[in-house]
């Protein structure tokens, strides 16, 4: 199959297995959920009644005071007491096979092509690391919410995009399923397309 280059009167021949396969919604969902789960810190921790600082002495005698019986100031019922089912640090990551991960990326890229959300260009750059230059370039292309993928990370482009809210710049090795579906449009250079094809082959 061929992808038309927007900034040139030509087309780029690409593999149909990478850019023309059927959309596997279940696979994409599984991989995206796993990717998001892997980004969780999982560092939350609370103290049980055994870990809270405080005396082990019984606050008052069992009977005769008229107050409710109590055996410890560290009881979860008490203010500043321990937590009954205390949270523990945990690893939320889920295992995803390479074949599944690549399959999900191919599905997403193919769907982007079908929905006309993937724009392929010969090259994409700015002369200087200026947000104004990139903003004007995107305005000329009628792009606002966009992920730009280049063959190699262009420092000028990267710095120019940092202050734009709905714009991100990645090199071909930095793509992931979440970022591909997070933006309205994806702009890829011809070099990036070839690199992605080789990565997913």
From Swiss-Prot:
Transmembrane annotation, as ranges: none
Biological role stated in the UniProt entry: One of the primary rRNA binding proteins, this protein initially binds near the 5'-end of the 23S rRNA. It is important during the early stages of 50S assembly. It makes multiple contacts with different domains of the 23S rRNA in the assembled 50S subunit and ribosome. Protein uL4 is a both a transcriptional repressor and a translational repressor protein; these two functions are independent of each other. It regulates transcription of the S10 operon (to which uL4 belongs) by causing premature termination of transcription within the S10 leader; termination absolutely requires the NusA protein. uL4 controls the translation of the S10 operon by binding to its mRNA. The regions of uL4 that control regulation (residues 131-210) are different from those required for ribosome assembly (residues 89-103).
Renumbered residue ranges of the record's region Disordered: 44-71
GO biological process per UniProt: cytoplasmic translation; DNA-templated transcription termination; negative regulation of cytoplasmic translation; negative regulation of DNA-templated transcription; negative regulation of translation; response to antibiotic; ribosome assembly; transcriptional attenuation
Similarity remark: Belongs to the universal ribosomal protein uL4 family.
UniProt protein name: Large ribosomal subunit protein uL4
General remark: The erythromycin sensitive allele is dominant over the resistant allele.
Subunit structure: Part of the 50S ribosomal subunit. In TnaC-stalled ribosomes forms part of the binding pocket for L-Trp with the leader peptide and uL22.
UniProt keywords, alphabetically: Antibiotic resistance, Repressor, Ribonucleoprotein, Ribosomal protein, RNA-binding, rRNA-binding, Transcription, Transcription regulation, Transcription termination, Translation regulation
Effect of residue 167 to D: Does not regulate the S10 operon in vivo
GO-annotated cellular components: cytoplasm; cytosol; cytosolic large ribosomal subunit; large ribosomal subunit
GO molecular function, a single term: translation repressor activity
